[in-house]
Amino acid sequence: MESGSTPPTDKQIRENEQDGTGHQGKLLARPTSTRQQQQQQQQQPSHSVSQSVSQSPQTQDCLTIVANMSADQHLQALTKVVVNNLENQHDWTQVQIHIQDNLPRPLIYGLPPKRLYVHPDEQIDIIRAEKQLNQRVPQEPELEWVLPLHLAEKWSISDFAAVFDAITALPPGGESVNANEDAQWQLWRGPKRGKRILLATVQDDSTVTYYWMHNGLVKPRQN
């Protein structure tokens, strides 16, 4: 065995701890356990964490502005996709973006190349008129409202109701027909026309699917 100093006994350690001196001029202390170290770390205040989490009012205002800008940019891009699809894929003309204070988002309206919707009761009036006139009644296209949506969005009934409450049955520039007892079928292009919107649902790959939505109940079409 190598020669060296004799290790201190437990009694010597206790004596050295009491008088403040250590063996060979050094204070001998028992090692601190892992649990004690964790308790000491928990007792220390974590100033760095609190500083990183807390935000000044100016920073919060900036984050709010950025969030609003992102939402506006999303709506602009969504509207642009639908307008492009209507004009280039479905040959719509007179396509306009409609912005209104009480609308939750911009709407689109335009003129399709052919008429897209005929009310079931209007269909009956047209058949009667064709029998009386002994000729076909022309079905000219009408201006239609379009609401751009993304497939991932979740809209409630109240959201759609707010849109219907904010619009008129005919988009701006639509020709309204006055009441005429001799041409009841024409009233469906004016006073009898209900509010309807073409939902333009955009998917992630820019594919657009269209659905009709009516304000109120509409009975099924008769074949």
From Swiss-Prot:
Q: Which family does it belong to?
A: Belongs to the SEN15 family.
Name of protein:
Probable tRNA-splicing endonuclease subunit tsp-1
Q: What does this protein do?
A: Non-catalytic subunit of the tRNA-splicing endonuclease complex, a complex responsible for identification and cleavage of the splice sites in pre-tRNA. It cleaves pre-tRNA at the 5' and 3' splice sites to release the intron. The products are an intron and two tRNA half-molecules bearing 2',3' cyclic phosphate and 5'-OH termini. There are no conserved sequences at the splice sites, but the intron is invariably located at the same site in the gene, placing the splice sites an invariant distance from the constant structural features of the tRNA body.
Q: Which gene is this protein's source?
A: tsp-1
The UniProt subunit note reads as follows:
tRNA splicing endonuclease is a heterotetramer composed of tsp-2/sen2, tsp-1/sen15, tsp-4/sen34 and tsp-5/sen54. Interacts directly with tsp-4/sen34.
Record's compositionally biased regions (Low complexity):
30-55
Q: Which GO terms describe its cellular component?
A: tRNA-intron endonuclease complex
Q: Which UniProt keywords apply?
A: tRNA processing
- Give GO MF terms, alphabetically: nucleic acid binding
Annotated region described as Disordered, given as residue ranges: 1-55
GO BP of this protein = tRNA-type intron splice site recognition and cleavage
- InterPro entries for the chain: Sen15_fungi, tRNA-endonuc_su_Sen15, tRNA_endonuc-like_dom_sf, tRNA_intron_Endo_cat-like_sf
